């Protein structure tokens, strides 16, 4: 059986990525459902934290938002390449750095899933101090 040659570290690493991916999907599904129930209004507001569903069609913080599908596909391809690079980096590191990279991979896979199936990434956590978001 091929799996008997895989190391304990592989199983731990895979489990971390799968857990973060699962939590990412679960939290987004939950917030999307809350948004539907609230008819699109703010889900939660406080002094420093708001939960508001926004569909991000760009990259980080909504940068480079656009409607051209070929540009969107190029960004998705770049994200896939970055995920591969992060996996390779995690294999070459140990301890906290390795696990941090694996958690980033899990979240990035969740975002890639959203880009493929929804053409946007649902963002909902808004930390702020006063008017600075």
Model feature map: region roles:
Residues 1-133:
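Alpha-helical transmembrane bundles and membrane-interface segments of multipass inner-membrane proteins
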